[in-house]
Amino acid sequence: MVIRDFKGINPEIGENVFISETASIIGDVKIGKNCSIWYNAVLRGDGEAIVIGDNSNIQDGVILHGDYITKIGNNVTVGHKALVHGATVGDNTLIGMGAIVLDNAVIGENSIVAAGSVVTSGKTFPEGVLLMGIPAKVVRELTEEDIEGNKSSAKWYVDTANGYK
């Protein structure tokens, strides 16, 4: 794994965090407790800060970077090969595999960005919705079952990461 400073700013890593051997965490990155950073993920805080809340998972091949601060809430799942670039992702949200969330976009809490979707720069979406498409649009409101699924995904990754320690 690569954990290194950028211009004298070091990453801050919370308690009980799993970081895979092939992940890269650089510069102004703050990771909350019980998080997991999976294989080939790149968290590059050499532009603006990256802040990740508690119990969140950054899956294989994800890139977090940006010209604006990147904020990932608590209990968030960022799926394989997704890109979050200078955006805000609310608590209990799932970013699907291969999704792209661009600069200054805001995803409300308790939401899902469907796999392969593109959230364009500057878009703000309310909480509790399913976003889908290129460009991403609200398809429907989430059910309580959907929201519980998001929370279960985050919990599963906390539990799974503990098996790697």
Task: Give the residues covered by each predicted segment.
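Charged phosphate-binding loop/patch that engages nucleotide di/tri-phosphates or the phosphate backbone
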Residues: 154-165
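Structural signal for interior beta-strand "rungs" in well-ordered beta-sheet cores
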Residues: 6-8, 12-126, 130-131, 136-138
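Short, glycine/charged-enriched secondary-structure capping and boundary segments
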Residues: 127-128, 145-147
